[in-house]
Amino acid sequence: MTDATVPTFDLAELREGLHQEEFRHCLREKGVFYLKGTGLPAEADHASGREIAVDFFDHGTEAEKKAVMTPIPTIRRGYAGLESESTAQITNTGKYTDYSMSYSMGTADNLFPSAEFEKAWEDYFARMYRASQDVARQVLTSVGAEPEVGMDAFLDCEPLLRLRYFPEVPEDRVAEEQPLRMAPHYDLSIVTLIHQTPCANGFVSLQVEVDGSYVDIPAQPGAVLVFCGAVATLVADGAIKAPKHHVAAPGADKRVGSSRTSSVFFLRPNGDFRFSVPRARECGFDVSIPAETATFDDWIGGNYINIRKTAAAR
């Protein structure tokens, strides 16, 4: 019988070496789990970073938003407007846009609309970074993976924090018209930590593929959601799964009250991380780079350009 549940682990227990067999099985077969005991901010701290961003989405002027849109096409920084991106385009699964808007920051080249915004996000970023490094260490160590540069150097990297706001969908984006708010994809990260807020009407929008079927992954109080990314798969030589996931659209009967947010922290390697292109393809990743080896910058830079080109041309 297929087990389609997403398990929950406690970080303190994993540090003590408990539940390792179950954890390795989860990493190999699912690549997704809830995690408690991370030491991440309490809900009020998550809310401070989230609410200041959503307030900017709702009340920032067009000029203010334009001022914090990055001119660099190969990175994600600052504001990205509603339907300005298309995950479907870069995954070759359609032409529809992501029905969301977002704000992103990294370790450099950031754009902030105010000093208050900057302070809230820098504090939040630092806490999420520390937690994601701890989680990644447990994930890689559990399967015996050792990065070529050493664990500490590998995890001293180039992460990205992105707050996505999914407003209520309009009538032409309900599930009967377009089933997804965001297309299926795997993450280009080592691990991804997600703190999501539920839809007010109870609809579960985030779903992950388990054994060929998509299952709901609702917000779980007191826990973050962890996706293992494609980089973890490569470092572990296939011993860790990078699961596909998508964001489903509500049906017409669930349209009202379907807004939600997702605070997503991508622990990504440094841009010079090098990998085998043929091995990446063997692991199921769509890498079109015409070379035997490539860097992470090669891989992700093209994705960022393509995600914007299509949306702008829609």
From Swiss-Prot:
Pfam families: 2OG-FeII_Oxy, DIOX_N. Residues 156-269 form the Fe2OG dioxygenase domain. It catalyses: penicillin N + 2-oxoglutarate + O2 = deacetoxycephalosporin C + succinate + CO2 + H2O. One of its GO terms (molecular function) is L-ascorbic acid binding. Keywords: Antibiotic biosynthesis, Iron, Oxidoreductase, Vitamin C. Its cofactor is Fe cation; L-ascorbate. Its EC number is 1.14.20.1. Pathway: Antibiotic biosynthesis; cephalosporin C biosynthesis. GO terms for biological process: antibiotic biosynthetic process. InterPro entries: DIOX_N (IPR026992), IPNS-like_FE2OG_OXY (IPR044861), IPNS-like_sf (IPR027443), Iron_ascorbate_oxido_reductase (IPR050231), Oxoglu/Fe-dep_dioxygenase_dom (IPR005123). Belongs to the iron/ascorbate-dependent oxidoreductase family. Catalyzes the step from penicillin N to deacetoxy-cephalosporin C. This is Deacetoxycephalosporin C synthase. It comes from Amycolatopsis lactamdurans (Nocardia lactamdurans).
